[in-house]
């Protein structure tokens, strides 16, 4: 399968570089089994039914972008990929010359980081913190960090991004990119779902910067995915079992929630626990758990476009994207949304495991 099969031309004007005035002020392109409908995001309520289970990713975006300088005075930009502990992180570092092991990077407020090594393309940074309320890496990021907006937004972060590039239900800090399908939901929308009899559950998958990395091979099968941390709570396993028992569907809000659910279902049934996944979903994949998906519009030739093509069929997805471009939908993180029904029923292995070893 060729990566070029997932290419399309997108006018630059359709890239959303700012969020809408209100979270729910987005359009919704609904791709169901028998129709393609142009709607508004609150119309999602007409596509979910009492007894369905909507599963959200509750990861919280950290202000992971830092600007500083090397000991030589040269400028440096750091994007934290993963917080390892209170003082150590794995990070992407941009500078005119890569910093050497043992060298120091200096930031605002007396915060410094020593380069202690490399792990592949990532730098291992050990932070020296000034104390006085800034004694952990997360607290340092809250003090001097910037919102890690995606590269295609192509502007500096603004005060409003701290709120809007974050879901209203975010609670587990660790992501460096937002699970953007969830950005459309406000508290009123969540309440309306519950009033409709729709159950709501949460997974955690800490989205990494690798989600924006281009596919650099010609054949889809040759691509290797980046790894991300996830956690499936035992309470969610119970919710999934109950939804299946009453005939409800599992609806993933976002590709990150879907990847976590599918990763934790590879051995049959949903397994509680935490672990890492580099699951790569592309056409030919057999879905084990997810029946429907809420998602934003994705980049050409991206792994996420391949994922939704696996879910609903490449021809149907590419046709829907052509219709969206013709209708002037807004694309990517701050853009509009889709509701997609899968073309195949998810496997119904009911041997869900509430607790067990990490996967």
From Swiss-Prot:
Membership in a protein family: Belongs to the QueA family.
Name assigned to this protein: S-adenosylmethionine:tRNA ribosyltransferase-isomerase
GO molecular function: S-adenosylmethionine:tRNA ribosyltransferase-isomerase activity
Cytoplasm among keywords: yes
HAMAP family, alphabetized: QueA
Domain of life: Bacteria
Sections of the chain in a coiled coil: none
């Amino acid at each position: 399968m060729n990566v070029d099969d997932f290419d399309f031309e997108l006018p630059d004007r359709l890239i959303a570089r700012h969020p809408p005035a209100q979270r729910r002020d987005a359009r919704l392109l609904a791709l169901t089994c028998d129709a393609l409908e142009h709607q508004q995001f609150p119309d999602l309520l007409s596509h979910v039914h009492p007894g369905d289970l909507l599963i959200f990713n509750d990861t919280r975006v950290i202000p992971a972008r830092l600007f500083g300088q090397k000991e030589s005075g040269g400028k440096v930009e750091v994007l934290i990929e993963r917080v390892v502990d209170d003082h150590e992180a794995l990070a992407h570092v941009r500078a005119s010359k890569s910093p050497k092991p043992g060298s120091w990077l200096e930031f605002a407020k007396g915060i410094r980081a020593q380069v202690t090594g490399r792990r592949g393309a990532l730098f291992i940074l050990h932070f020296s913190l000034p104390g006085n309320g800034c004694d952990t890496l997360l607290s340092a990021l809250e003090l001097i960090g910037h919102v890690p907006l995606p590269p295609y937004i192509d502007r500096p972060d603004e005060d409003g991004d701290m709120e809007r590039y974050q879901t209203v239900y975010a609670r587990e800090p660790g992501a460096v990119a937002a699970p953007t399908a969830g950005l459309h939901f406000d508290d009123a929308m969540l309440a309306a779902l519950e009033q409709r009899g729709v159950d709501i559950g949460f997974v955690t998958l800490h989205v990494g910067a690798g989600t924006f990395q281009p596919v650099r091979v010609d054949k889809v099968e040759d691509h290797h995915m980046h790894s991300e941390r996830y956690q499936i709570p035992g309470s969610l396993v119970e919710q999934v079992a109950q939804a299946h028992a009453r005939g409800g569907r599992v609806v993933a809000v976002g590709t990150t929630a879907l990847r976590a659910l599918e990763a934790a279902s590879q051995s049959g049934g949903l397994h509680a626990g935490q672990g890492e996944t580099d699951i790569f979903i592309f056409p030919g994949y057999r879905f084990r758990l997810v029946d429907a998906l809420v998602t934003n519009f994705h980049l050409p030739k991206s792994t996420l476009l391949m994922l939704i093509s696996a879910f609903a069929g490449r021809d149907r997805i590419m046709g829907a994207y052509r219709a969206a471009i013709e209708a002037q939908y807004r694309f990517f993180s701050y853009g509009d949304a889709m509701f997609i029904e899968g073309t195949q029923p998810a496997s119904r292995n009911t041997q869900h495991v509430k607790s067990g070893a990490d996967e």
